[in-house]
């Protein structure tokens, strides 16, 4: 049973998947930082200083000025967080689209290289005839 598990865990696809998950996690953190630390402040500046992380609709309780306070007081719809996560998702989806497109292009290049055609029977017989003719002349 241990041997079966070892074969399963060390298969090429399993290791590739593990590496992909680790890199994906790191990439997700990088995209989060890009969105929260670079893109959203620029969008906030363009839109007149709007802080998307603090945009919400309070459904219950006394009106609050921060999302954290509003969540403590009752139900909220944090649409600012949704906008941030949507931008985050779009960046990740775009990068994955580009990676898949690149992989498909590389696969097509590999498939496009035709294997050398095997010589036909006629070509082989012609070559044999020519060799025999040379041997008879010599």
UniProtKB/Swiss-Prot annotation:
SUPFAM superfamilies: Gated mechanosensitive channel. One of its GO terms (cellular component) is plasma membrane. It is found in: Cell inner membrane. It comes from Brucella ovis (strain ATCC 25840 / 63/290 / NCTC 10512). Channel that opens in response to stretch forces in the membrane lipid bilayer. May participate in the regulation of osmotic pressure changes within the cell. HAMAP family: MscL (MF_00115). The chain crosses the membrane at residues 15-35, 38-58, 80-100. GO terms for molecular function: mechanosensitive monoatomic ion channel activity. The gene is mscL. This is Large-conductance mechanosensitive channel. Pfam families: MscL. It is a multi-pass membrane protein. Keywords: Cell inner membrane, Cell membrane, Ion channel, Ion transport, Membrane, Transmembrane, Transmembrane helix, Transport. Its main location: membrane. Homopentamer. Belongs to the MscL family.
